[in-house]
Amino acid sequence: VLAEAVKDTLGTVIIENRAGAGGNIGVGAAARSAPDGMTLGIATTASHGINPWLFKQLPYDPVKDFAPVTQMLRVPNVLVINAETAQRLRINTVADLIAYAKANPGRLNYGSGGNGSAGHLAGELFKNQAGIFAVHIPYNGGAPAQAALLGGQVDFNFDNLATAAGNIRSGRLKALAVTTAQRTQVMPDVPTVADTLPGFE
């Protein structure tokens, strides 16, 4: 999408996807490229805000190796539960999830795209603010975590709204809340976690 949008201005754009290690592989490659203005890297909260605290040695310096250009987008996370699990456990709201977790300590688990991922950190913040316990199950990326949720291997996830939206609309996942301070225009009927846990973002 980006390459198409800028081709008339910049000419041919070559997209090179280098996933892995929480963004470190791709961002590291961008950092090692020639500083000639011909390479753009797309950084994330993970690559520049979280990973410096998780990894002893990064293949880049998040401050010195880059010149920021613009913020391209902001995608909220969404607290989702497998629709069949939601029906079986009678969980329709964030308050229901919290009440179930408190009444059944240690019974719930949640998946994420890996230790230190946005979904993991949101899950830990949620547990802390709600005063509940749920076992964290880290996966090797967001796609396997969502597959585990769809397959019923985990009870809930804090997932990227862009990747979860299709399964929410199809009815396979139930969106309980978004993690942003305000509701999202993409799904305006979905409340915020902060509606139940004030200050959560």
State the predicted function of each range.
Residues 23, 47, 86-87, 116-119, ...:
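Alpha-helix N-cap/loop-to-helix initiation residues
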Residues 24, 73, 80, 158, ...:
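Short aromatic/basic micro-patch
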